[in-house]
Amino acid sequence: MSLVYMNIMMAFTVSLTGLLMYRSHLMSSLLCLEGMMLSLFILATLMILNSHFTLASMMPIILLVFAACEAALGLSLLVMVSNTYGTDYVQNLNLLQC
C-alpha cells in the first residue's frame, strides 16, 4: 500500500476520532464530518483512477453531491440551533424538547 493511501486513511481516522471525541459543539462535529467526506472523495477518486474502472467514474461526483447536501443541512441546523438557544451545543438537539 502506498504512502498516499495510508495518509488518506489516516486523515479519515483522525476525522472519525475527532467526531467521536469532540462532540460538544455542532460546528466541530460538522468540520469532522467534512474531513471524513473529503478523505473518502479523494480515496475513491484515486482508486478509480488507478484501477481504470470507467464505469464507476461518477461515484466520486455523487459522493461530493451528498457531501454538499450534508453540509447545507448541517449549517442550516447550526443556524437554527444558535438562533433558538444561543449556543451550538449538541446537547440542545434533544428531540423530546423540540
Swiss-Prot record:
Keyword Kinase part of the UniProt annotation: no
Transmembrane residue ranges: 1-21, 29-49, 61-81
GO molecular function, one term: NADH dehydrogenase (ubiquinone) activity
GO biological processes: ATP synthesis coupled electron transport
Keywords for the protein's UniProt record, in alphabetical order: Electron transport, Membrane, Mitochondrion, Mitochondrion inner membrane, NAD, Respiratory chain, Translocase, Transmembrane, Transmembrane helix, Transport, Ubiquinone
EC number of this enzyme: 7.1.1.2
Domain of life: Eukaryota
Catalytic activity: a ubiquinone + NADH + 5 H(+)(in) = a ubiquinol + NAD(+) + 4 H(+)(out)
Subcellular location: Mitochondrion inner membrane
Topological category with respect to the lipid bilayer: Multi-pass membrane protein
GO CC aspect terms: mitochondrial inner membrane; respiratory chain complex I
InterPro entries referenced in this protein's UniProt entry, alphabetically: NADH_UbQ_OxRdtase_chain4L/K, NUOK/Mnh_C1-like
Protein's UniProt keywords contain Cell wall biogenesis/degradation: no
Broad class of where this protein is predominantly found: mitochondrion
Subunit organization: Core subunit of respiratory chain NADH dehydrogenase (Complex I) which is composed of 45 different subunits.
Family to which this protein belongs: Belongs to the complex I subunit 4L family.
Function: Core subunit of the mitochondrial membrane respiratory chain NADH dehydrogenase (Complex I) which catalyzes electron transfer from NADH through the respiratory chain, using ubiquinone as an electron acceptor. Part of the enzyme membrane arm which is embedded in the lipid bilayer and involved in proton translocation.
Protein name (record): NADH-ubiquinone oxidoreductase chain 4L
Organism: Ovis aries
Gene designation per UniProt: MT-ND4L
